[in-house]
Amino acid sequence: MEAALIYKPSSAFLLAMLVCVPAMAANETSKTSDIIGHVQHLTGSASVVRGSAAVPIAAGAPLYQGDVLRTGKPGAVGVVLTDATTISMGSGSEMALNDYAFAPKDSKFALALKLIKGSFAYVTGQIVKLSPESAQVHTPDATIAVRGTKLLIQIDEMKE
């Protein structure tokens, strides 16, 4: 007859679990609350660079501050941010979501897009309506302070 192994968790293990489990849950909540928008429409191929990894995206994919979106050839992406800003990217385009804040209750507004190459249609949302000075669109040649409601932009690839 074999002896049964009885496991009694140590106090250190229980203390570690009490600290770690709420921290892990808070981390998951913060990931959800850091979503700044989503991919509403996708045709062809597209990817997002998040950190150092490029991964394919699909319609409905969440977007985060710091993401870099790339469309393939052929490819097109429609993006909607949480303030109702809409951005359409044409084939062979690249855009970085550099800065974003939309917290009307705290009067926190920021929108900084870096359009790297390709074609874009941009329709402003609530950030421009509530705090026009908080929105900027950067291109390789200029920075645009957005005050209107619609922009169409074409950026050719830089030749060295």
Feature annotation, model-predicted:
Residues 2-13:
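Bacterial N-terminal signal peptides that target proteins for export
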Residues 25-69, 73-160:
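Flexible, surface-exposed loop/linker segments and immediately adjacent secondary-structure boundaries
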